[in-house]
UniProtKB/Swiss-Prot annotation:
Its EC number is 1.2.1.80. It comes from the Bacteria. Keywords: NAD, Oxidoreductase. Disruption phenotype: Abolishes the presence of alkanes. Its cofactor is a divalent metal cation. The keyword NAD applies. The keyword Repeat does not apply. It catalyses: a long-chain fatty aldehyde + holo-[ACP] + NADP(+) = a long-chain fatty acyl-[ACP] + NADPH + H(+); a long-chain fatty aldehyde + holo-[ACP] + NAD(+) = a long-chain fatty acyl-[ACP] + NADH + H(+). Catalyzes the NADP-dependent reduction of long-chain acyl-ACP to the corresponding fatty aldehyde. Involved in the biosynthesis of alkanes, mainly heptadecane and pentadecane, by producing the fatty aldehydes used by aldehyde decarbonylase. GO terms for molecular function: oxidoreductase activity. It comes from Synechocystis sp. (strain ATCC 27184 / PCC 6803 / Kazusa). Belongs to the short-chain dehydrogenases/reductases (SDR) family. This is Long-chain acyl-[acyl-carrier-protein] reductase.
Length: 340
């Protein structure tokens, strides 16, 4: 059985959907309450592959909120993720994806040292960040979006915002090895990590956001920012493709300009309906079929019997692993969201 650990996009979102999640008493509560709220299994469902195989899964709501990071409630954030992982293990989930900020909190605060959660010793082989599948899906979205807009990738300038992260660095490797894109613009906060990535790739220009964006034919946004940013659409190239791989996805409401096309990055659509409630709550356009690619990775690992931490650690994603999870994705009926 597989699992998905997720969270809501904000305190306001959490209050609005608390009743749908099954705990209406949380609806009027503030951040202090959510900091102490325990994780809960809020959805049970089946997923059917186009091969005919059927598997069962559970959704674990961690009760983590991005405000816990922005308001420096770090201990609460750490506790949320570890407690949700412990619950997933206690209810017998064989492979569980850490969705949204869950994997970021785990990596940034080095939680692999915290493997004892009360009476549960965490087995990290039972968890995956889902980042390999997410990176694969974003790359396929770049390829499809570029084709739809008539952008030749071999002649394109691609800016990757969040280039040193797990997903961003994987996207850079794919675009370099598969397409030899003309220019890779590397954007991130940590200069040393940028220089390390540049050395690994043997290419790429390190730039700040304001300098890079006007030069880019394609922008891949995979920065882990709890709050959205402002991008002036008029300063971007036309046409310009933006693949919004962040969470929550809000660039489509923040960047409005003719000739600027935005794809919801890291989203896949399944060929068959899934009877779950959670994707309605996170406001997918077609909740019975669409989901985050990181969640789909846990589903694929369960279908394939690869019960291991397929995506784990920082900057470990190879093009070969992206190809492997991509083949499984196609085999079981998933496809990236590519309609502009």
């Amino acid at each position: 059985m597989f699992g998905l650990i997720g969270h809501l996009t904000s305190l306001e979102h959490a209050q609005a959907v608390a009743e749908d999640l099954g705990y209406p008493e949380y609806a009027n509560q503030g951040l202090d309450f959510w900091c102490s709220a325990p994780p809960q299994v809020v959805d049970n469902f089946q997923v059917k592959s186009v091969t005919g195989q059927v598997i069962e899964g559970k959704y674990v709501e961690s009760c983590f909120l991005p405000e816990m990071l922005t308001q420096r409630r770090i201990k609460a954030a750490i506790r949320k993720i570890l407690n949700a992982m412990a619950l997933a293990q206690k209810v017998g989930l064989d492979i569980t994806a850490l969705g949204g900020f869950s994997s970021i909190v785990f990596e940034e605060f080095n939680l692999k040292q915290n493997n004892q959660v009360r009476n549960v010793e965490l087995d990290f082989q039972r968890f995956t960040t889902g980042n390999t599948h997410t990176a694969y899906v974003i790359c396929r979205q770049v390829e499809s979006g570029a084709k739809q807009l008539g952008i030749d990738l071999s002649q394109a300038t691609v800016a990757v915002c969040g280039a040193t992260g797990d997903i961003g660095s994987a996207v850079c490797r794919w675009l370099d090895s598969k397409h030899q894109v003309k220019e890779l613009l590397l954007i991130a906060r940590n200069r040393q990590r940028l220089e390390n990535l540049q050395e690994e790739l043997g290419r790429g220009k390190i730039m700040d956001l304001e300098t890079a964006l006007p030069q880019a034919d394609i922008i891949v946004w995979v920065a882990s920012m709890p709050k959205g940013v402002e991008i002036a659409g008029e300063m971007l190239k036309k046409p310009c493709l933006i693949v919004d791989g962040g969470y929550p996805k809000n660039l489509d409401t923040r960047v409005k300009a003719d000739g600027v096309h935005i794809l919801k990055g890291g989203i896949v659509e399944h060929s068959l309906d899934i009877t779950w409630e959670i994707m309605k709550i996170v406001e997918m356009d077609i909740p019975s079929r669409q989901m985050f690619a990181c969640f789909a990775e846990a589903i694929l690992l369960e279908f394939e019997g690869w019960r291991t931490n397929f995506s784990w650690g920082r900057n470990q994603i190879s093009v070969n692993k992206m190809e492997a999870i991509g083949e499984a994705s196609v085999k079981h009926g998933f496809c990236p969201l590519v309609a502009l």
